[in-house]
Amino acid sequence: IPRKMSNVNSYLAAKTDDFAKILEHEQEILYMMAGQVSQNKMQEETKKKTASKKTAKTILDAMGLKIVPAKKTEIMRIKKLLGQDASRFYAAWKVINKRTQRNFDDFLKEEGDIETKLLWHGSRNENWISIMQLGLVLCPVTQITGKMFGEGIYFAPKAHKSLGYTSLEGSYWVGGKSNRAFMALFEVAYGTHYHTDTSYGIGRNFGYNDLQRRLKGAHCLHAHAGSVLRNDEIIFYKENQVS
């Protein structure tokens, strides 16, 4: 992505293994920019409607979002699910993306009575506006970065695992430098799940059709801690299985 760089060398690959990291970082920037562009368009539309004396909408209305402070009972549950990181809790909000929630609800109706779970997802601070507005999307960059279990949306049952992907100072996977970070609990359609404790035979292009060949009717892949993972990961290959 063309832009001003303070030190070009820091953006260059020193070894082959750096290619995937650089491409993933550039993709995250594009994802963030897409959300910002969409938000700016909505702000302009809101201003025009207000100026023409039509019913004024808030930015959140234009983005299709409803955000309210979490209730006391919800906060208690969040802290419980944070486990060893409960002391890091600062504040919580309930975010409803009307479009993704509608798609999720429709999926549950089609599938019938299937189990849902609340699972953690961590990301850098700058990504959250896009995530709230666009939802979690299946990103083509996974074909390049070679995520261990293919082209999916990744979650963790343990908060500490997801914390490593946030901007928090010292975060394990992204080397965060911030004293504040954000994580989210997503309701997901866990349903029928394919269990594995190895990535053997699961290529970087592994997707929903591949999952069905492993276990017909499976909604997700549950990778258990063991020989290749320190913590469980649960991967979904359809966007409408995530709220």
Predicted regions and their residues:
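Intrinsically disordered, low-complexity terminal and linker regions
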Residues: I1-N127, G226-S243
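Segments that shape or occlude catalytic/ligand-binding pockets
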Residues: K47, S52, D105-S243
